[in-house]
Amino acid sequence: MRLMPLAATALAALALAACSGAEESPPADETLPAAAAAMAEVANVRFSLAVDGEVEGLEIAAADGVVTSGGEAEGTGVITAMGMDVEVSYVIVGEDAYVKGFTGGYQQIPVGDDMLPYDPTVLLSPDRGVAALLEAYESAEPQESEKVDGVDAYRYEIVFDPVAFAEFIPAQGEWNTATVWFDQETSRVVKAEFEQGGATVTLAFDDYDDSVDIEAP
């Protein structure tokens, strides 16, 4: 008679595991090439970049906005200047950037100026962006799949080629290892998280290929 409760407990545990939906992501050599191809086809995307801690070479605390594959971007950011966090609005069209601080109007500056230390147009650049980075990975370990912001996602621990990564994010140090989540349906990147030395850089994407119109102010 004592076997019945034990059997019931075992069955309940199996049922709970099945209901959790957690399963290992597919092999990386299946997912990453598909993801690289999917990201190469993206016309525009909304992104958010958050920096927790000090990241040498990346003089921003946060950034968000919309970026296009044509080299345009628009949004807001928090840059670090003279030890202070300064919120700015920005527009990038081609080789020109326009930045506006808390007061005053937009100032035209070249892309890469200290007033805009991170160029978000790199995200969809065919040579330096997400797609190129995914093609240049050195190793990737599948982990349990999970939901990210309501999206069913495959999760991987990925080591990227350090040279390719240096083109992607100008952070000094060994930042080329990341946890990356891919949309199970579209293979597009949902989120990437980089950690090193107690600091974290989180990059998230949504609203892929919405209608956008970015013009110089």
Where is each model-derived feature located?
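C-terminal motif of bacterial Sec signal peptides marking the signal peptidase cleavage site
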Residues: A15-A18
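Subset-of-secretome marker
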Residues: S20-P217
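Bacterial N-terminal signal peptides that target proteins for export
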Residues: M1-A8
